[in-house]
Regions:
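Structural signature of tandem-repeat unit edges
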Residues: 1-14, 20-34, 44-57, 67-80, ...
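Consensus positions within tandem repeat domains that build extended binding/scaffold surfaces
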Residues: 37-39, 59-62, 83-85, 105-108, ...
């Protein structure tokens, strides 16, 4: 065995609670059944990892911050990968999960910036929210054809309940059309898809998740289908090139930070049913000139903050003083006359 025993702190029950070694090639001893929370946190010298067949659980943040880790030679017999387990493993290039894996926790591979390929097994039944957020180099997801919960089409990950789970942001395509029948875009589904200029959405779509298009910075325009009634916070945040968005008639709320940092957005027409604009919804939309709305009841804090080009906010009704955020129009050019003309 290449490791000295003092490198690992293992309980009698087989839980590895901490690693104190400095090796580049780390082989976790046979008999370990669980990697404890933050056990390998910041083990920056580790480049290669081998896990034993006895392993069942990788705890939350287990290998987070292992920024030199390039290869997991074996995941052993792991069934459960905890939240943020491989957070910010920025050198990790490929992940081939074993047939035993059933669950991937929320943000498990968040920030794995060079991860290019991901293989998911037959047994997998649960993928947590934003499990692959920040994997901006991801080009393809492969799923076992025997998996009953998930499948891939042209390298894009879907579940069998009608949700697009993850579009690989490292693909070099300029356009993508979501297939008919998809009714939901998962949280972070298209986040950091920086090559995309156009995305076609199906009429079946009803929900757009939190941060769904976050930092899709070359996306130019988007038409949301009429059935969409739910849009998550930050859904279009930091889409710098987004100049036009068509919003559906059934929308009642613009969520917090929905369009923050959309520097190319110039004019927005809100559907007549929208009564609430969330906090920071248009924060930093520096080219935004006009907003047309219906009967607004609530305008959140900083909703139009730093909208330096804003000249007009027109609505059939606007909130009384005190029902809009104290800094809703802070630094906006329309601050002196936020009700527009």
């Amino acid at each position: 065995m290449q490791m000295v025993k003092s490198s690992f702190d293992v309980t009698p029950e087989g839980r590895l609670v901490s690693y104190r070694g400095y090796e580049s090639n780390v082989i976790v001893p046979t008999g370990v059944t669980e990697i404890g929370e933050r056990a390998f946190w910041g083990a920056r010298l580790m480049t290669r990892l081998t896990l034993p067949a006895s392993l069942r659980v990788i705890g939350a943040w287990g290998f987070a911050g292992c920024t030199s880790l390039r290869e997991v030679a074996s995941f052993g017999g792991v069934t459960d990968i905890g939240a943020h387990a491989f957070f910010s493993c920025t050198a990790l290039a490929e992940v081939w999960l074993p047939p035993t894996v059933r669950r991937i926790g929320a943000a498990a591979f968040d920030g794995c910036a060079t991860l290019g390929f991901l293989s998911l097994p037959e047994a997998l039944t649960d993928i947590g929210d934003m499990a692959f957020r920040g994997c901006r180099s991801l080009r393809r997801v492969s799923v076992s054809p025997k998996n009953r919960m998930f499948y891939e089409r042209e390298g894009v990950l879907f579940d069998r309940c009608g949700q697009l789970v993850r579009y690989p942001p490292g693909r070099d395509a300029f356009a993508y059309t979501v297939p008919p029948g998809v009714h939901s875009l998962a949280d972070g589904a298209f986040s950091e898809a920086t090559m995309l200029r156009e995305v076609g959405l199906p009429g079946s779509l009803t929900r757009i998740g939190q941060g769904a298009f976050y930092r899709a910075k070359h996306l130019r325009s988007l038409d949301l289908p009429p059935r969409v009634t739910e849009i998550g916070a930050e859904a279009f945040g930091a889409c710098e090139a987004l100049a036009r968005v068509g919003l559906p008639c059934g929308l009642t709320t613009v969520p917090p930070l929905a369009f923050f940092g959309c520097a190319g957005l110039t004019d927005v027409a809100l559907p007549p049913g929208v009564t609430k604009i969330g906090e920071g919804a248009f924060l930093g939309c520096r080219s935004l000139r006009s907003v047309t709305a219906g009967r607004l009841r609530v305008v959140g804090e900083n909703a139009f903050s730093d909208c330096v080009s804003l000249r007009s906010v027109s609505a059939t009704a606007l909130p009384r003083v005190g029902t809009s955020g104290n800094e809703a129009f802070f630094t906006a050019a329309a601050q002196k006359n936020p009700r527009g003309g």
